[in-house]
Amino acid sequence: MSDIISIKDIDLAKKKVFIRCDFNVPQDDFLNITDDRRIRSAIPTIRYCLDNGCSVILASHLGRPKEISSKYSLEPVAKRLARLLDKEIVMAKDVIGEDAKTKAMNLKVGEILLLENLRFEKGETKNDENLAKELASMVQVYINDAFGVCHRAHSSVEAITKFFDEKHKGAGFLLQKEIDFASNLIKHPARPFVAVVGGSKVSGKLQALTNLLPKVDKLIIGGGMAFTFLKALGYDIGNSLLEEELLEEANKILTKGKNLGVKIYLPVDVVAAPACSQDVPMKFVPAQEIPNGWMGLDIGPASVRLFKEVISDAQTIWWNGPMGVFEIDKFSKGSIKMSHYISEGHATSVVGGGDTADVVARAGDADEMTFISTGGGASLELIEGKELPGVKALRSKENE
């Protein structure tokens, strides 16, 4: 992806630099950050700017606020960032209001300003050019380091790039790393290449599954989405999650896999329970024998053994989506075991999506994976072969 303008191609000295980060981190009920991976991932780009004599304005969204609310404030992010960088972070009370503009204007070389949650401005998610213009007016250089939102045409991701020429906009280190990794994975995977796809919905991953089939050697389907495929095969799935309108599509994928010579593996047994709760009885049942009124909530031990065998000779594994309702302890075993087996092997292991990254962190396997992508939807769309709006905006025109 050498046609993407890199931060290294830009003269940053003594300039004000806007870095679009992805600080959309999980928090507990007391607003404590429970996983700061996304904040830590942004540090190399921030440090590079400081080392090159800039002043830095950071911007991000957090959650999906309907209105301005302290629950969605970036204050906790500012505190965590200050600790990680061992440096004071100036926090703006707004995004393009008087406070942000005054603080941006007075920012000196080596200082960092964090704007308040971008989504407090209604125009952010509408790709509003007026908002983009206001943000752009604070700085001389724009850097996008937020892979997790590159698939969205938002003001701070796409519209803003129209106000900078090629000498003054580019991709940060995290964004470059993510794009390079995903591109190489799709174009030159070491084989056998196995995709492990889970999560609750087929609808969200239909395009990715279709696009992956010609590229992979084997495909494992787990999680809630597996039941639509099992139903398509004529199995009785009890009260398990089902997207009835996608049964035909599921059948098409199974047929396409067969025609391409791709082995598709579905769960052979499941952990079934009458309800999705920690306090209900559970039992292991074959995938064809889920009792009426019960639902499958995790893959069972036989499926775990089968999937372990399937990935044992893999040279590349791409994993997106948990194998069960991992948030509930008794239905997390399948996902945790898959994480262990993927991380223990010799394959290049690429993990995409927030839920999957959470499983890997919970399993204690994060350091053993080759690459953990910070973007769920964005990594899916890259795998689907789509051009991401935030990335397209940073392409060098000469190479288009």
Swiss-Prot record:
PROSITE patterns, sorted: PGLYCERATE_KINASE (PS00111)
Species of provenance: Campylobacter jejuni subsp. jejuni serotype O:23/36 (strain 81-176)
Listed GO MF terms: ADP binding; ATP binding; phosphoglycerate kinase activity
Gene: pgk
UniProt lineage: Bacteria, Pseudomonadati, Campylobacterota, Epsilonproteobacteria, Campylobacterales
Entry keyword Metal-binding: no
UniProt similarity note: Belongs to the phosphoglycerate kinase family.
A GO biological-process term: glycolytic process
SUPFAM superfamilies: Phosphoglycerate kinase (SSF53748)
InterPro entries: Phosphoglycerate_kinase, Phosphoglycerate_kinase_CS, Phosphoglycerate_kinase_N, Phosphoglycerate_kinase_sf
Binding-site positions, ATP: 205, 296, 327, 353-356
Known EC number: 2.7.2.3
Record's subcellular location: Cytoplasm
Listed name of the protein: Phosphoglycerate kinase
